[in-house]
From Swiss-Prot:
Residue ranges crossing the lipid bilayer per the database entry: none
Post-translational modification note: Phosphorylation at Ser-460 by ERK inhibits interaction with CLSTN1 and localization to cytoplasmic vesicles.
Subunit structure: Oligomeric complex composed of two heavy chains and two light chains. Interacts with SPAG9. Interacts with ATCAY; may link mitochondria to KLC1 and regulate mitochondria localization into neuron projections. Interacts (via TPR repeats) with TOR1A; the interaction associates TOR1A with the kinesin oligomeric complex. Interacts with BORCS5. Interacts with MAPK8IP3/JIP3 and NTRK2/TRKB; interaction with NTRK2/TRKB is mediated by MAPK8IP3/JIP3. Interacts with CLSTN1; phosphorylation at Ser-460 inhibits interaction with CLSTN1.
Record organism: Rattus norvegicus
The keyword Protein biosynthesis appears for this protein: no
Annotated Pfam families: TPR_10 (PF13374), TPR_12 (PF13424)
Biological role stated in the UniProt entry: Kinesin is a microtubule-associated force-producing protein that may play a role in organelle transport. The light chain may function in coupling of cargo to the heavy chain or in the modulation of its ATPase activity.
Residue ranges that the Swiss-Prot or TrEMBL entry lists as coiled coil: 27-156
A GO CC term attached to the entry: microtubule
Region of interest (Disordered), ranges: 156-203
Protein name: Kinesin light chain 1
Any one GO molecular function term: kinesin binding
Modified sites of kind Phosphoserine: S162, S460, S521, S524
Segments annotated as TPR repeats: 213-246, 255-288, 297-330, 339-372, 381-414, 464-497
């Protein structure tokens, strides 16, 4: 029998082990309900026994009732204990449910974080791949960089970089004004020469400029050079009004003031107004001074420059030719000012593709400069450089190369004497390095290839441009070692020039910081400084920067 009872208990325990949590909770609730009902029933019986006990006397029957009451109290205690344990089980079940719910939330968070981590890993891998591709592209671009620089050099081989114009150092320019007076001269020089030039004009033109007009003229120049057009323009207009009242419209003084006002308008980019004023001044000078007067040639040249600035090369060419004819007639065909006019005319023709005429004009100007000013005059090198640019445009690379070498050789001879085996110009060293590049490769500095480019004594913009252009030509021929030699020499020369400019600016700041600050503020606004010059004929002219074809920036010098 004992074995049977053990088997029954084991079967019951096995059944309990197979119950789910929900089934256990449900069974527990049923047990609680049963225990509550049994407890209520025992309480009723106990109350009934107690009331019966009150009615009975103390005898055997009352003892029996007390014994029953005692048993029922014990049963109630056991029922209450069972209820307490059942409630504890319910509370524990609720707690387990809450723990399970929190565990599920944490698992969901873990899954989400794992997904985010995987996404970040994928993004990192993609970024690393892109970075690797970018580095490969950069390496390829570095390999092609020198070739692309060479292609760019072909487009701007006639770029003439002035060390004092750092901003324009990389822009392509047609050096029209390179043969004319330097644009960077002190504007005050032109102001100081006004009285002497006005006197010469009075002698040649047969009229005398009033002192008041000369004063106004100088004031306008001063204000315009400072960029104070709001003052310069009213001064010109007031002077014009007074002159027309006293002398009439058709008077040389009126033409002079019209020319000055036109140049002020030109600097403000008011080209249409400037052209109208110059045409009016031209008509007055032709009427009062004659069609072949030098002042007429100056006005014609100013008007041609203005048309060239607007890209109207065909309209500018006949004006420039007429100015050339007047200068040849008055000054002679071999005068340096005629050569300046020839250079203006050559560039106008070059922008129209008339290369045969360009060659003729440049060659003629070169002959005049060499004859009248000597082979060492800066205008000779500049004209050769312009002529070489014309050759390059036509594909005449051999002729261009010859001119470039002549410029560099002459620059070397001026500084270090005649060329021999121990004293060679830079282009010879460059070609020697090209020939020896397969035999030896050294990192020699340029100090071993002559001293003029290392010392930067020959640091003119023309020589710097020639170095760059000849270097571009070498690249076209596949002479990369020679090209690098010239390009590095040009870079050093330009750097030395910029250092000199910085030192000069520091000195200017120390001497007169207020004026320098004003000029810097004007330069920051890209306002060109107007420089008026009066020739011996009394014609006011200006050196101006001219935009050609929207890309090339050229300097049109207004010759006298």
């Amino acid at each position: 029998m004992h074995d049977n009872m053990s088997t029954m208990v084991y079967m019951k325990e096995e059944k309990l082990e197979k119950l789910t949590q929900d089934e256990i909770i449900s069974k527990t609730k049923q047990v609680i309900q049963g225990l509550e009902a049994l407890k209520n029933e025992h309480n009723s019986i106990l109350q009934s026994l107690l009331e019966t006990l009150k009615c009975l006397k103390k005898d055997d029957e009352s003892n029996l009732v007390e014994e029953k009451s005692s048993m029922i109290r014990k049963s109630l205690e056991m029922l209450e204990l069972g209820l307490s344990e059942a409630q504890v089980m319910m509370a524990l079940s609720n707690h387990l449910n809450a723990v399970e719910s929190e565990k599920q939330k944490l698992r969901a968070q873990v899954r989400r974080l794992c997904q985010e981590n995987q996404w970040l890993r994928d993004e990192l891998a993609n970024t690393q791949q892109k970075l690797q591709k970018s580095e490969q592209s950069v390496a390829q671009l570095e390999e092609e960089k020198k070739h692309l620089e060479f292609m760019n050099q072909l487009k701007k081989y006639d770029d003439d970089i002035s060390p004092s114009e750092d901003k324009d150092s990389d822009s392509s320019k047609e050096p029209l004004d390179d043969l004319f007076p330097n644009d960077e001269d002190d504007p005050g020089q032109g102001i100081q020469q006004q009285h002497s030039s006005a006197a010469a004009a009075a002698q040649q033109g047969g009229y005398e400029i009033p002192a008041r007009l000369r004063t106004l003229h100088n004031l306008v120049i001063q204000y315009a050079s400072q960029g104070r057009y709001e003052v310069a323009v009213p001064l010109c207009k007031q002077a014009l009004e007074d002159l027309e009242k006293t002398s009439g419209h058709d008077h040389p003084d009126v033409a002079t003031m019209l020319n000055i006002l036109a140049l002020v308008y030109r600097d403000q980019n008011k080209y249409k107004d400037a052209a109208n004023l110059l045409n009016d001044a031209l008509a007055i000078r032709e009427k009062t001074l004659g069609r072949d007067h030098p002042a007429v040639a100056a006005t014609l040249n100013n008007l041609a420059v203005l048309y060239g600035k607007r890209g109207k090369y065909k309209e500018a060419e006949p004006l420039c030719k007429r100015a050339l004819e007047i200068r040849e007639k008055v000054l002679g065909k071999d005068h340096p000012d005629v050569a300046k006019q020839l250079n203006n005319l050559a560039l106008l023709c070059q922008n129209q593709g008339k290369y045969e005429e360009v060659e003729y004009y440049y060659q003629r100007a070169l002959e005049i400069y060499q004859t009248k000013l000597g082979p060492d005059d800066p205008n000779v090198a500049k004209t050769k450089n312009n002529l070489a640019s014309c050759y390059l445009k036509q594909g005449k690379f051999k002729q261009a190369e010859t001119l470039y070498k002549e410029i560099l050789t002459r620059a070397h001879e001026r500084e270090f004497g005649s060329v021999d085996d121990e004293n060679k110009p830079i282009w010879m060293h460059a070609e020697e390095r090209e020939e020896c590049k397969g035999k030896q490769k050294d990192g020699s500095s340029f100090g071993e290839y002559g001293g003029w480019y290392k010392a930067c004594k020959v640091d003119s913009p023309t020589v710097t441009t020639t170095l760059k252009n000849l270097g571009a030509l070498y690249r076209r021929q596949g002479k990369f070692e020679a090209a690098e030699t010239l390009e590095e020499a040009a870079l050093r020369s330009r750097k030395q020039g910029l250092d000199n400019v910085h030192k000069q600016r520091v000195a200017e700041v120390l001497n007169d910081p207020e004026n320098v600050e004003k000029r810097r503020s004007r330069e920051s606004l890209n306002v060109d400084v107007v420089k008026y010059e009066s020739g011996p004929d009394g014609g006011e002219e200006v050196s101006m920067s001219v935009e050609w074809n929207g890309m090339r920036k050229m300097k049109l010098g207004l010759v006298k």
